[in-house]
């Protein structure tokens, strides 16, 4: 086992790059090996104030979410767990963690349960990103986190004996287990997501370069992979009887909860909506950078590598955190695509007048 202590130095670079206030809290993540592929993460609040943050899609989440990235010979090992989109307001307490200054918590998990490590050998593990912080159960900002780089030697026999977190379901038609009002809602969401994606593709290719840079953090002429990903989402959303993904109206794996809108299983290109997708979200929002069914569906489609490869990750949620990412992270951040699709005044589906100059919305999500 080899541990490289990079967290403090990299967090300092992150804080400088984002021009965060000097007293901005950060989370320091220390990864250690427990036994073979079983890993312990110790998360510490290095700031001088108490923070409450969303621990879903992060350490302490009991679901098979992506807590770390695994690399073998410089290539990332495919993640076989779930990626989910969360509420940004009205969050329940069971999705929140509070840490006092200097406070810590630990989380143990087995990386072989969400990644094929049966080849054994040297595997490098690390993680970084932003965790949403909350005020009165509403996301009000973000806190950066960064881990050390942990190098482990994997025993292939032991790795093969670790049960996979998710057992694949039988393949079905593109839209599965849908009927009644949910089928109607999903049909509308797919149609709207397709229209938003196609309009966003045009905005990315020939719209404002300033707006493009605002979201994707690059001054180069709109990388083709942005417009290409939006166009691919538009194609995938255009048919409910064929396509490259399987879309469930309900929760086939049991990973929905009171804070989860929908989730994607990238390794099988499966998407599932949760109950609050229907009960909480409008079909289309009239508010700048707010959540709705259409952009949630668009968000999930970007996770699926069969739609456009590589699939996106969840480096950050919401406008403030997503526009604080580096260019390389923003280009692979699912919420960046959802926010760009919602936040462009070129898009025809809902009232986006509040987003006509999104640069003034830095205080929003």
From Swiss-Prot:
The keyword Transferase does not apply. Glycans are attached at residues 73, 351. GO terms for cellular component: extracellular region. It comes from the Eukaryota. The active site is at residue 300. Its EC number is 3.4.24.39. One of its GO terms (biological process) is proteolysis. It is an enzyme of class 3 (hydrolase). Belongs to the peptidase M35 family. This is Neutral protease 2 homolog mep20. It comes from Aspergillus fumigatus. The gene is mep20.
């Amino acid at each position: 086992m080899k541990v490289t202590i990079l967290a403090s130095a990299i967090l300092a670079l992150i804080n400088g790059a984002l021009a965060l206030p000097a007293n901005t809290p950060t989370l320091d993540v220390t990864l250690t090996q427990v036994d073979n592929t079983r890993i312990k993460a110790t998360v510490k609040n290095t700031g001088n104030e108490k923070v409450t943050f969303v621990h879903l899609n992060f350490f302490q989440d009991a679901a098979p979410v992506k807590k770390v990235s695994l690399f073998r010979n410089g290539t990332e090992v495919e993640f076989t767990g779930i990626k989910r989109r969360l509420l940004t307001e009205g969050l329940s307490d069971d999705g929140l963690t509070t840490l006092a200054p200097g406070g810590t918590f630990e989380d143990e998990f087995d990386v072989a349960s969400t990644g094929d490590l049966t080849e054994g050998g040297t595997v490098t593990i690390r993680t970084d990103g932003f965790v949403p912080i909350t005020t009165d159960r509403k996301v009000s900002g973000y806190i950066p986190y960064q881990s050390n780089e942990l190098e482990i030697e994997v025993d292939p026999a032991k790795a093969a004996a670790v049960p996979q977190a998710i057992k694949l379901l039988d393949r079905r038609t593109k839209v599965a287990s849908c009927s009644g009002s949910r089928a109607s809602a999903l049909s509308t969401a797919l149609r709207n997501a397709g229209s938003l994606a196609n309009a966003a593709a045009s905005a990315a290719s020939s719209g404002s370069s300033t707006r493009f840079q605002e979201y994707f953090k690059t001054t180069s002429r709109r990388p083709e992979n942005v417009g290409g990903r939006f166009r691919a989402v538009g194609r995938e959303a255009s048919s409910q009887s064929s396509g490259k993904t399987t879309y469930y109206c309900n929760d086939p794996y049991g990973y929905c909860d009171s804070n989860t809108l929908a989730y994607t299983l990238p390794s099988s290109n499966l998407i599932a909506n949760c109950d609050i997708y229907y009960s909480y979200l409008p079909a289309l929002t009239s508010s700048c950078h707010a959540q709705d069914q259409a952009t949630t569906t668009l968000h999930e489609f970007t996770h699926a590598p069969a739609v456009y490869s590589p699939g996106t990750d969840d480096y950050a949620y919401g406008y403030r955190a997503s526009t604080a990412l580096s260019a390389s992270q923003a280009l692979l951040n699912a919420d960046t695509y959802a926010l760009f699709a919602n936040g462009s005044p070129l898009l025809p589906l809902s009232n986006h007048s509040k987003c006509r100059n999104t640069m003034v919305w830095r205080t929003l999500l």
